[in-house]
Amino acid sequence: MPTYNRYDMSRVIETYVVNPKYRQVLQLRYVEGLTHEQVAEVAGYSTQHVKSICKNYKNYLISLL
């Protein structure tokens, strides 16, 4: 079973949760349950950028587990 260190987890939290740009996208996508297209419209980003943020966030979390 792979292990993670606290620095890796804090880096993920700092990058995706503390940063307001990413926090808004992640909240709209995972808390509010909006589609990528709806999140892009509300946040003012392209759909591809929203997909990229969500994919990178999930990959970081998966890599830590």
Positions of predicted regions on the chain:
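Short, Lys/Arg-enriched C-terminal cap helix and immediately downstream tail that follows
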Residues: 58-65
